[in-house]
């Protein structure tokens, strides 16, 4: 792991601790005893289902990548896809960019014999669909559950609306990178020239020749999805399932503690608004911002128990998925190391 990854990993732990401390210390109604009581008395079946949904959030992303890899002619399994999804979820959580996990996913895909250009195309398509799926679900939530959005505080609504703007912008950027290989080539070429100037690399001309050949294959791979409406709809479906899995985590937890179906549905909608708003700032995992929006939304449903329920739901939707992803990555890395030997 390079220094940048180490820095953001340490920063993420610090921000996570600070976020949890802020939630606990600033809430007059938070009680560790009440929190533990919620956990002890919760229906274990619903809690188990919340973990299944957490795993689904990872699995569905990986399976979407597997389906694209197979379309490009490269054999890979759903188990391999779980590692790809885990790598993306984990490294996205510890870096300040929502797409920070893509290089980690690409690493495992390349290790499994998928060329870099094909992995890049697959990841870019998935990023577009991942973004569009959240915008689609978010739009439905705004139409059918607008009162929930309206009852957020002004600051939370600013975060949510700005997050929507960022999501639309990112979707357009990812699409342009996918369809216009010349843009990606210019970015890579500029990076090579910069590294040459500061004497980190030599023989930049050789790298540029290799880059041109790679970009030609990249563009051919990208063009191969033109007219493949069925494939794109399928990838969009798997991304919708990934997003739904994430939203259902809070649903399952509310059912586990006996809050009822109506509140469980509403908390899933609030979770969607949190997911959109969390894109408004370049902070690892949107820690702090996501917690603020979530508590603000939970006050509409559980009043003084908002902080306790926020820690339960945030603990599973974010920290639970990060820990699960870390375990998946570790196992996947060890297995690939043994196979390589």
Protein language model features and the residues they cover:
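Transmembrane helix-loop-helix hairpins in multi-pass inner-membrane proteins
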Residues: 1-37, 91-201, 283, 287-341
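Alpha-helical transmembrane segments of multi-pass membrane proteins
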Residues: 79-88, 118, 265-276, 305-315
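A short amphipathic helical element positioned immediately N-terminal to and/or at the very start
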Residues: 33-41, 214-226
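Membrane-embedded helical hairpins/re-entrant loop segments and their flanking transmembrane helices
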Residues: 60-86, 90, 253-270, 294
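Short, membrane-interfacial amphipathic segments enriched in basic
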Residues: 25, 197-218
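Membrane-interface helix starts
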Residues: 6-7, 41-50, 223-237
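Hydrophobic faces of transmembrane alpha-helices in multi-pass small-molecule transporters and flippases
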Residues: 47-51, 86-94, 124, 232-240
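Transmembrane helical segments that form the transport core of multi-pass membrane transport proteins
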Residues: 224-273
């Amino acid at each position: 792991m390079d220094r940048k990854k180490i820095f953001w990993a340490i920063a993420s732990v610090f921000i996570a601790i600070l976020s949890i401390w802020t939630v606990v210390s600033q809430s007059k109604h938070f009680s560790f005893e009440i929190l533990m009581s919620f956990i002890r008395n919760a229906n274990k079946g619903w809690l188990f289902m919340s973990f299944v949904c957490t795993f689904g959030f990872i699995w569905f992303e990986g399976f979407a990548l597997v389906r694209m890899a197979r379309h490009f002619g490269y054999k890979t399994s759903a188990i391999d896809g779980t590692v790809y999804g885990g790598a993306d979820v984990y490294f996205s959580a510890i870096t300040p960019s929502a797409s920070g996990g893509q290089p980690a996913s690409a690493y495992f895909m390349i290790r499994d014999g998928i060329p870099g250009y094909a992995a890049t195309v697959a990841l870019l398509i998935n990023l577009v669909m991942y973004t569009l799926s959240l915008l689609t679900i978010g739009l439905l939530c705004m139409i059918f559950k607008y009162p929930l959005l309206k009852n957020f505080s002004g600051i939370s609504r600013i975060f949510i609306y700005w997050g929507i703007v960022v999501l639309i912008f990112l979707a357009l950027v990812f699409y342009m990178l996918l369809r216009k290989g010349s843009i990606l080539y210019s970015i890579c070429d500029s990076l090579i020239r910069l590294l040459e100037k500061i004497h980190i690399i030599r023989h930049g001309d050789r790298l540029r020749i290799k880059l041109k050949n790679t970009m030609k294959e990249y563009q051919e791979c990208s063009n191969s999805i033109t007219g493949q409406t069925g494939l794109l709809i399928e990838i969009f479906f798997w991304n919708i399932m990934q997003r739904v899995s994430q939203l259902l985590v809070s649903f399952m937890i509310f059912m586990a503690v006996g809050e009822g179906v109506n509140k469980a549905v509403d908390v899933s909608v609030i979770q969607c608004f949190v997911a959109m708003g969390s894109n408004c700032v370049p902070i690892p995992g949107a820690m702090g911002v996501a917690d603020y929006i979530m508590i603000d939304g939970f006050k509409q449903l559980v009043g003084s128990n908002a902080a306790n329920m926020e820690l339960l739901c945030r603990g599973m939707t974010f920290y639970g998925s990060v820990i699960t992803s870390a375990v998946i990555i570790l196992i996947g890395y060890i297995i690939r190391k043994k196979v390589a030997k």
